[in-house]
Amino acid sequence: MDLGRRITRDAEHRYIGSGLMIRALLSALLFLTSGLAAQAANDIAQIQQGLDSPVIVDVRSEGEYASGAIDGALNHPLQGLPGTLIDMGVELDEEVIVYCRSGRRSAQAKTLLKQAGFQLVFDGGPMTQLEQVLEQSEP
């Protein structure tokens, strides 16, 4: 089947032509991202309440980390997780806060670490947001 013919035929299809498929996909995307945003907000609230002695992990690239990072943060790019934290001796029951530039990689990092058995992982989201939260929660 020729791709051009299939697209033409699909374009004439009632559901695609009327935009119902696109609307359904957008609705599903909004639903999924709102769930992630709610999880991140919950994590931020827990960070604000104060954690004992969390390991703060910057999951950005080495170059991004070199351009500036949160004081005391360790650089473990997303591609190396969870292995680099395990190799460093971070225990599965330690509090770990992950952050990045925009919040996308930190959400992925949280998922990877949870799947590896880390129990107390918090998504700090974007670096600028986490900096503000940490400053506000300092005594």
Tell what function each PLM region has.
Residues 4-6, 16, 23-24, 36-54, ...:
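Rhodanese-like catalytic fold shared by cysteine-dependent sulfurtransferases
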Residues 25-33:
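Sec-dependent N-terminal signal peptides
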Residues 13:
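Cationic, low-complexity basic patches in intrinsically disordered or flexible, solvent-exposed regions
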Residues 99:
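Short, surface-exposed ligand- or partner-binding patches at beta-edge/loop junctions that are enriched
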